[in-house]
Each structure stands twice: as C-alpha cells, then as structure tokens.
Regions:
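Conserved protein-kinase catalytic-loop position immediately C-terminal to the HRD catalytic Asp
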Residues: 110
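Conserved ATP-binding subdomain of kinase catalytic cores across diverse folds
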Residues: 2-75, 114-117, 156-158, 276-277, ...
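Regulatory N- and C-terminal appendages and interdomain linkers associated
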Residues: 136, 141-345
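ATP-dependent phospho-/nucleotidyl transfer catalytic cores
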Residues: 20-104, 114-221
Length: 345
C-alpha cells in the first residue's frame, strides 16, 4: 500500500508465538507489529466521550490537536476544525482505496484512524472483476463494507466522531449539533468532486466536465457488464493498439476508446501526456488474492519463496511495467468468485 501511494501503517516485525490459530483452517500463530503516525481512532474518541468526563475529553482532544494538527490550535473552534480535517483526510484515503481497487473489509470506528492512514489489515483484499458490490470478508454477509459502500461507511464513522465532539464544539448542545451537521453534510459534495477527479486522472484528464463524467460512467458500466478486471482495463486502454485480450477487442470497447481519444483532443491533451498521467496513477501490479494465497502456501508449507519474492519485488514498484512478471497481472479465471478473507488474512 505504501508503494501504491496510499497512506498506511507499516510492518515492523513478525514474531512466531508457537501457538495454533483457528480460522478457516488451523494456522501457525504469530504477532505482526505495525507502526503509524498515530494509533488513535474514531473509536478512541467514542470511548472517552461515552465513559469519561468532559474535562478528560477536552484534554484528550487538545493532545490530539497538539500532536497531529497543531495548526488547528489557533482556530476559532479547534474541535470543529478537527472534525473537518479528519473528514478530509478520510475522504482522501477512501479515494485512494477506490483508485486501486482496495477493499478494507471491516471499517468499524475502531479501524478508522484520525490521521487518515490505512490500518488493521484483516479481511482485506483487492478487487479483480469490477463490481461495486464486491465483498470478500467472510463476516460481511450483508455487504456493509463492499467496495462501493466504503465512502458511505466513512461518512457514518465521521458522524460518530462528530457525536463524540459535540460537548466541545459548543456549550449549547443544539448549536453544537447544527455546526457538526453542517460539516457532515458537506461530505457528499467534497467526496464526489474528488471521486470524479480521481477517475479523470486514471484516464489521463486534467479536469472533469460533463463529457468526461459520461465517459467515466460508461467505462465503469462496461467493466461491470463485461466482468472486466479493474486494474487490467486501465492497462488495456494505455496499451490499446498492442492489445491481445479478446475482451478489449470488441466493437463496443473500440467505440468507447474512440470517444476517449476524441475528448482528449478536444481538451488539447496529447495521447503521450495522457498515458504518462495514467502510468502514475494506475498500477501495473496489485497483490492478486489468489497469488498471495499461493505464495504463502508455497512459503509456509514447501519453503518455496519464489512466488513470494516475485510479489515482493513487484509490490515495491507497482507502477513500473516489468515484462518478466506479466504472469502476476493475470486475474484468476473466475474473477475470485467464492474467494473469502478472514481476520487472519
């Protein structure tokens, strides 16, 4: 995730415990230590607000601002400014997840950092075939944390943060609620604007107007209807004239591609410039779920680290084309249908 350009915690160490862990099958137990700029979550604010007094909540909030957002201390209303700042951090984070096809899998308030970093890599996975309802987590039977539901869950979690901060935003509870609500109500417009920008950049555009928006929507619809791989579709666009995959050698895709070229020309964007932008924002490689599983089985059961090392190498340079590792771009034949992740994943 770090090399994909996504704010994230980082792995520090793995220590074997010698114990057995029972998930979908029996695993060898281990403890993974991760580091990040803060382990304070929305859930931390909920705990302090619900179980401790207002003075402690005020001191805790002051500490968070001093440590992570000192510029907010001079704001007329630091707690409200903190809510706005965390909201923007979280919008940027989920936009990055959507850009690369990442599904977190368990987005409760204890798994939402106030610094906008990805952490708690439990039942997470990367999407192959594009569909907004894609779910991999074995415990997410209702699809609450599906790929396309993630922005809504972020907003829900921000509501929880706002509720925790109400006593500090204003002594008048009704006034505080109204002020917090105004911040939360701004979420959809801010998110949607950044979502359009992200999707535009993935296609090489510098700005997004109505023509670009329709083109983006049509591409996503085409991917969904044709069960096209999310990552590889953008690579297919960038390498259209060298394309050998039959899925992208069809009249309907050719028609869409021609519209894309026409809109680029109308915006005075050269094909080479667009492709350069696309290369910087569309990964060549993602950690394909079936390959990750296979690499772990090979390493743990057979002491064969070949695939593991290949995945490690490409994950450190995910935006660089590496012809010798083309096989790592291949999605599973069934698009990961039936694949499930667990808390130990």
């Amino acid at each position: 995730m770090y090399h994909l350009g996504v704010p994230t915690s980082r792995s520090l160490s793995v220590v074997s415990t010698g114990e057995k862990v029972y998930r979908e099958k029996v695993h060898e137990g281990a403890v993974l230590a991760r580091v990040m700029s803060s382990h304070i979550r929305v859930g931390t604010f909920e705990y302090v607000s619900n179980f401790l007094d207002v003075a402690i909540l005020q001191g805790f909030t002051n500490y968070v601002i001093k440590r992570h957002y000192p510029e907010l201390a001079k704001n007329a209303n630091p707690p409200l400014a903190l809510l706005k700042t965390v909201m923007n951090k979280q919008i940027d984070l989920v936009i990055n997840w959507l850009r690369i096809g990442f599904i977190h899998g368990v987005m409760n308030t204890d798994n939402m950092s106030i610094t906008g970093e990805t952490f708690d890599y439990g039942p997470c996975a990367f999407m192959n075939n594009y569909h907004p309802d894609t779910v991999f987590s074995s415990i997410d039977v209702q699809g609450r944390y599906a790929f396309g539901q993630q922005p809504g869950i972020v907003q829900w979690n921000l509501v929880c943060l706002a509720e925790a901060l109400i006593p500090l935003i204003d002594k008048d509870a009704d006034k505080a609620v109204k002020m917090a609500q105004e911040v939360i109500n701004s979420f959809p417009a801010i998110y949607k604007e950044k979502w359009w920008q992200m999707n535009g950049i993935k296609l090489g555009f510098t700005s997004v107007a109505e023509n670009e928006k329709q083109l983006i929507e049509d591409l996503l619809t085409w991917m969904q209807n044709n069960q096209a791989d999310y990552t590889n579709t953008y690579l297919a666009i960038a390498n259209y004239y060298q394309q050998t995959d039959e899925k992208y050698i069809t009249p309907d895709f050719a028609q869409w591609y021609q519209r894309w070229e026409d809109i680029l020309k109308a915006n005075n964007i050269s094909l080479s410039s667009a492709l350069k932008t696309m290369q910087q924002h569309n990964p060549e490689f993602i950690p394909r779920n079936h390959l990750v599983e296979k690499s772990l089985d090979n390493a743990c059961l057979q002491q064969n680290f070949t695939l593991f090392n290949e995945l490690l190498k490409t994950s450190k340079a995910p935006y660089q084309a590496q012809s010798s590792y083309k096989h790592l771009q291949t999605p599973p034949p069934d698009g990961d249908k039936g694949y499930k992740t667990f808390c130990g994943t």
